[in-house]
Design a protein with these regions (language model features):
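Transmembrane alpha-helices and their membrane-interface boundaries in multi-pass membrane transporters
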Residues: 210, 220, 226-242, 258, ...
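Pore- and gate-forming transmembrane helices of large, multi-pass membrane proteins
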Residues: 194, 246-278, 617-639
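Extracytoplasmic
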Residues: 56-182, 186, 470-556
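Internal alpha-helical transmembrane segments of multipass membrane proteins
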Residues: 164-195, 207, 270-273, 541-563, ...
Length: 639
C-alpha cells in the first residue's frame, strides 16, 4: 500500500550477516550489564557461566564459537537483548514470540508514509488491510492476525464521526427546517440564519488566522457558540418582522430591536474578550474567534437582513393563547414569579453539592473494544505496552547522554525492586568511557576464564582484547539498532536524548521525584498525566475568567438599570449556569474543561435572552416567541 512508507518483516540473509558482523566486530564494546557483573572480582563468575553454557544441552555452543569468542561476549549481549526486548526473539530471520498455547506469532512492522490522522489515507489503508486479512484467512483458515497502532483508532474515530454526522446531522437539519417552516411558513429565515452564521464563522476564522497564524482545535469546538448565539440575532429580528411586518417597514422593525441586539453583542463580546487575559493560545484564539465572529453575524443582521427579508410572510404568533396565559401568570401569580426561581436555585444548590471534578482525559473517549482487545493481546505476547510513559535522559553530546543513562540505570533498578515499575527498557549501547572500563575488566578476567577452560580439558584459547569502540552514529547506522532507533533523539545543535520506556507504573508522582533527584539531564514524561494536568489548568483558568465575565456583565447591567433591576436581570443567567452544573452532577457526570466551555456558551446565549426580554421597544409576546424559537433551534443544532 502506498500509505505505508516502510514495511519490515523477515530479515534477509544479507541483513542477518551484517547484523551478526556488527556484533562480532564490536563485541568488546557491547558488553551487557549481566556480563559486566560476572566480570567483576577477577572474572570467576564469568568463567563458571561459560562452563555452564558449554555443558548445557540446550545452549548449542559450537567449537567455532568458543575459539572465536572464548569470553562469549556476543552470546551474552544477545541474551541480554532478548531479555531487554522481553518475549521477542529472532528465529529464521523473523522476530517471533510464543503464546502459552505454544503458537508462534511473527511480527510485521509498518511505518506510515504520512500522518496517522490523514483520514482519507488511513481509511484506504485500513480497507486494504482488512481485505488482505480476509484473503489470508481464506487461504489459511487457522491463521490469526492481531493489529495495533494509532492508525486503527484514528480511522475508527473518523468513520464513527462521519456516521454520527450523517445520521444526527440529517435529523438535526430536518428538525430545524420543520421548525422554521412551521413558524414562518417560509424557508427564507433558514437561509438568513445560514448567511449570518456563515459570515460570522468565516470572519472569526480569518481573524484568528491573521492574528495567530493557526487554528486551535479548541477554537473549532467553540465555533459552536457562534452558531448558537448568532442564530439568536437573526431569529429575534425575523420574529419581529413576522409579527409586525404589515404595520412597519423592515427598517422600522430594525430600529425596534437594534439597541437590544447591539447591547447583547457588546455584552457577549466583552465577556469573551476578557478571556484574552488567559496565557493559553487555545483560549485566546477562542476569544478572538467568538468576538469577531459574533460581531460579523450581528452586523450582517443589522445591515443586510432588512434588505433580504422583504416578502417574508406575516402571520399571528403561533400558540398565542398559550404564550399569553404564561405571560399573564408570570405577572400576576407571585407563587410562580418567585417560586420558580427559588425552586431552580434550590435545585442548583442541591445538584452542585454533589458536583465532582475529573480531568482524566481517558474518560473523554470510548475506545473500540475490538481494537482494544487486539492491543492487549499484542501487549501480552510481546511484553511491550503502548503506555506513553518514559524517562528522557538528555545531554549536550551523545556521550554525556549515555553516561547519564548509565548512572540513572541504578535508580531504575531500585524503582523496579520497590515495585514502582514492573520493567524498563534501555538501549543496548555503552558510552565510550564505559567501554574503556569494560575493556579493563575483560583484560583482568581473561586469565581466569582461560585457566578455567584449560582445567576443563579444552584447547587453549586466546581472547582478542583489543579495543572495539562503538560510537553512536555507527550504531544508529547499523542493523544492530533496528527497533531501537526511535528511542534516540538528536537535535541540530548537537544535543541528544534517549527515551527509557517504563511499564507497570504505580505512581507517576514518585517517578517524577526520582527524576527530580538528579541535578539535570533527566525528565519524567507521562503523556496522559501531562494532558490531565493541562486540562485541569485550563479548567481553573476558564473558571476564573467565567466568573470575571459574569462580574463584568453584572457591572454593565447595574450601570444601565440600577442596582435592583440590574441584579434581577442577572438571575436567569446565574440560574442557567447553576442548573446546568446541577443536571451534570445528578446525571453522574463530572465537571471538566469541556463542561466549562459549555457554560461559556450557556452564558452567552442566556445574556441574549435576558436582553431581548428587557427591550423596552419590543413586546413581551414577540420576545417570548423569539426566545422560544431560538432555544429550540439551538437545542436542535447543538443537541
Amino acid at each position: 500500500s502506498a500509505a505505508l512508507g516502510d514495511v519490515k518483516g523477515p530479515m534477509d540473509a544479507a541483513s542477518q550477516q551484517a547484523w551478526g558482523a556488527f556484533f562480532w566486530q564490536h563485541r568488546n564494546g557491547l558488553v551487557d550489564p549481566d556480563t559486566r557483573a560476572r566480570l567483576q572480582n577477577g572474572g570467576e563468575a564469568q568463567a563458571q557461566w561459560i562452563l555452564s553454557q558449554l555443558y548445557s544441552a540446550f545452549s548449542g555452543v559450537s567449537g567455532k564459537e568458543l575459539q572465536n569468542d572464548p569470553l562469549m561476549l556476543m552470546r551474552g549481549s544477545q541474551l541480554a537483548m532478548a531479555k531487554n526486548g522481553q518475549r521477542l526473539r529472532l528465529m529464521d530471520g523473523w522476530l517471533v514470540t510464543q503464546d502459552p498455547q505454544g503458537n508462534y506469532w511473527y511480527l510485521l512492522h509498518g511505518e506510515l508514509a504520512g500522518s496517522s490522522f490523514d483520514m482519507q489515507q488511513t481509511h484506504q489503508l485500513i480497507t486494504t488491510l482488512n481485505t488482505l486479512e480476509k484473503d489470508l484467512k481464506t487461504r489459511y483458515p487457522q491463521a490469526q492476525l492481531l493489529s495495533r497502532g494509532t492508525v486503527f483508532y484514528s480511522d475508527y474515530a473518523s468513520q464513527q464521526a462521519k456516521q454520527d454526522i450523517s445520521n444526527l446531522g440529517v435529523a438535526t437539519l430536518l428538525g430545524v427546517i420543520l421548525l422554521i417552516v412551521a413558524v414562518f411558513r417560509s424557508l427564507r429565515p433558514l437561509l438568513l440564519c445560514v448567511i449570518s452564521i456563515g459570515i460570522g464563522a468565516l470572519a472569526g476564522t480569518v481573524a484568528t488566522l491573521l492574528i495567530f497564524g493557526e487554528l486551535h482545535l479548541m477554537t473549532l469546538v467553540m465555533s459552536m457558540s457562534v452558531i448558537g448565539i448568532s442564530a439568536d440575532y437573526t431569529l429575534y429580528y425575523l420574529t419581529e418582522r413576522m409579527v409586525h411586518g404589515n404595520d412597519v417597514s423592515p427598517w422600522q422593525s430594525l430600529a425596534k430591536v437594534r439597541n437590544a441586539l447591539l447591547l447583547a453583542l457588546l455584552t457577549t463580546v466583552a465577556a469573551y474578550l476578557i478571556m484574552m487575559l488567559a496565557p493559553f493560545p487555545g483560549i485566546r484564539q477562542m476569544a478572538i474567534f467568538a468576538a469577531v465572529g459574533l460581531s460579523a453575524s450581528c452586523l450582517t443582521v443589522l445591515f443586510w437582513h432588512p434588505w433580504l427579508c422583504r416578502g417574508l410572510p406575516v402571520r399571528p404568533v403561533p400558540a398565542m393563547a398559550l404564550m399569553l396565559r404564561w405571560l399573564a401568570a408570570w405577572r400576576r401569580n407571585k407563587k410562580l414569579s418567585l417560586g420558580l426561581p427559588v425552586a431552580l436555585a434550590l435545585f442548583s444548590l442541591a445538584g452542585m453539592s454533589m458536583l465532582r471534578v475529573d480531568d482524566d482525559i481517558s474518560q473523554l473517549q470510548a475506545l473500540p473494544q475490538h481494537i482494544l482487545a487486539q492491543e492487549k493481546a499484542i501487549t501480552a505476547l510481546t511484553g511491550q505496552s503502548v503506555d506513553q510513559k518514559w524517562f528522557v535522559v538528555y545531554g549536550d553530546s551523545p556521550q554525556q547522554t549515555l553516561r547519564r543513562l548509565e548512572k540513572f540505570t541504578a535508580s531504575l533498578e531500585n524503582a523496579k525492586k520497590e515495585g514502582l515499575i514492573s520493567n524498563y527498557r534501555t538501549i543496548p549501547l555503552n558510552s565510550l568511557a564505559r567501554q574503556e572500563e569494560d575493556l579493563h575488566l575483560l583484560k583482568t578476567a581473561a586469565p581466569t576464564v582461560t585457566k578455567a577452560l584449560q582445567n576443563a580439558g579444552l584447547a587453549a584459547v586466546n581472547p582478542d582484547l583489543n579495543a572495539m569502540p562503538v560510537k553512536v552514529d555507527e550504531w544508529l547506522a547499523s542493523p544492530a539498532s533496528e527497533g531501537w532507533r526511535l528511542l534516540w533523539l538528536t537535535l541540530k545543535n548537537g544535543e541528544s536524548g534517549v527515551l527509557v520506556p517504563v511499564e507497570g507504573v504505580k505512581s507517576s508522582a514518585l517517578l517524577q521525584e526520582i527524576a527530580s533527584d538528579y541535578p539535570g539531564g533527566i525528565a519524567w514524561v507521562d503523556r496522559k498525566s501531562t494532558f490531565d494536568e493541562l486540562f485541569a489548568l485550563y479548567r481553573y483558568v476558564l473558571t476564573g475568567l467565567l466568573l470575571v465575565a459574569l462580574a463584568v456583565i453584572a457591572c454593565g447591567a447595574v450601570a444601565r438599570l440600577g442596582w435592583r433591576k440590574g441584579l434581577i436581570s442577572l438571575v436567569p443567567s446565574v440560574l442557567s449556569l447553576g442548573c446546568g452544573l446541577a443536571v451534570l452532577a445528578m446525571s453522574g457526570q463530572a465537571v471538566n474543561l469541556f463542561s466549562l466551555l459549555a457554560l461559556v456558551l450557556v452564558l452567552g446565549i442566556g445574556i441574549n435572552y435576558t436582553l431581548f426580554f428587557s427591550n423596552p421597544r419590543g413586546t413581551p409576546l414577540t420576545s417570548l416567541l423569539a426566545i422560544t424559537l431560538a432555544m429550540l433551534t439551538t437545542l436542535l443544532a447543538l443537541g
